[in-house]
Design a protein with these regions (language model features):
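Conserved beta-strand hairpin/beta-sheet module of binuclear metal-dependent hydrolase folds
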Residues: 1-45, 131-143
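Hydrophobic residues at beta-strand termini and immediately following loops
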Residues: 7, 109, 122
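Residues that act as N-cap/strand-start positions at coil-to-secondary-structure junctions
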Residues: 12, 101-103, 126
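Short, glycine/acidic-enriched loop or turn micro-motifs at the edges of active sites
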Residues: 22, 33, 59, 78, ...
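Active-site neighborhood of phospho(di)ester-bond hydrolases with catalytic His/Asp-centered motifs
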Residues: 28-30, 50-58, 72-75, 121-124, ...
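Active-site HxH/HxHxD metal-binding segment of metal-dependent hydrolases
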Residues: 33-112, 199-203
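Conserved N-terminal boundary motif of the eukaryotic protein kinase catalytic domain
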Residues: 116-118
C-alpha cells in the first residue's frame, strides 16, 4: 500500500491509514463514523493494525472507537469527549441521538512507545487536541487544529481562542516547512503553503 491513504466520512472528517514501516503493519489517525469501511479495506488487503491515534475527542473523529478492537491512544484531557459521543452528536444531527458510551481502554498518547511518532499538544479546538508528526513520512496530522485554508472552531466545549492563538505560535511554527500537513477535514498541503496562504495563520502568527 502507499504510505498514507485517506478515508472521508459523511461528517467530512478524515481517517488516515499510515504505513510507517516496510511491512503490513498500519496505524490509523482518527476513528470517524466510516471506520467499518477502513477496517474492511485493512482486512481485504491482509494488513495488521498496530493501533490508532486520535487527534481529539469530538464524535466525528472518535465515534469509531465503538467498532475498534485494537489499541487506541488519545490525550486524556479529551477522554470524556471520546467516551461520550451522545453529548455531541445530537446537536450535529438535529435530534437527540443515543450512542453507547465507549467502555474500552484508552491509552495516554503522551506515553506512547513509538520511535517514529512525535506528539504535539495544541489546545484551542479542544483542551486535549494534539497533532502527530511522522518524520520518516514527512507528514504531520493536525486533526481540527489547522486546515488548509482555516483553523478549528474554538466555540465548542473546552475550546479556547486564546489557547488556539498560542498553539499556532508555539506549535504550528515547529512543523517543518516541507512537510505535508494532513488535516481532520478537507485537503492536505505543505506546511509552507499553509503558512503563506491560510488567512487565519497569517492573522494570528506573530512573525
Amino acid at each position: 500500500m502507499t504510505d498514507i491513504k485517506k478515508f472521508t466520512s459523511f461528517a467530512t472528517s478524515n481517517c488516515y491509514l499510515i504505513s510507517p514501516f516496510d511491512n503490513e503493519i498500519v496505524f490509523l489517525i482518527d476513528l470517524p463514523p466510516n471506520i467499518d469501511e477502513v477496517i474492511d479495506y485493512i482486512n481485504t488487503n491482509n494488513l495488521t493494525i498496530g493501533g490508532a491515534f486520535i487527534t481529539h475527542g469530538h464524535w466525528d473523529h472518535a465515534i469509531g472507537l465503538s467498532s475498534f478492537d485494537s489499541k487506541a491512544y488519545i490525550n486524556l484531557d479529551d477522554e470524556h469527549l471520546a467516551r461520550n459521543p451522545s453529548d455531541q452528536i445530537g446537536d450535529f444531527l438535529g435530534d437527540k441521538v443515543s450512542v453507547n458510551k465507549y467502555e474500552g481502554n484508552l491509552h495516554n498518547v503522551l506515553d506512547h512507545e513509538y520511535d517514529f511518532l512525535n506528539v504535539y499538544i495544541n489546545p484551542g479546538h479542544t483542551k486535549g487536541s494534539v497533532s502527530f508528526e511522522f518524520k520518516d513520512l514527512g507528514a504531520v496530522f493536525t486533526g481540527d487544529f489547522i486546515f488548509k485554508d482555516s483553523i478549528g472552531r474554538t466555540d465548542l466545549y473546552s475550546g479556547d481562542n486564546n489557547e488556539m492563538i498560542d498553539s499556532i505560535n508555539n506549535v504550528f511554527t515547529l512543523f517543518q516547512d516541507d512537510f505535508q500537513l494532513f488535516p481532520g477535514h478537507g485537503d492536505d498541503d505543505t506546511v509552507i503553503n499553509i503558512k503563506n496562504n491560510n488567512p487565519f495563520i497569517r492573522e494570528y502568527l506573530k512573525w
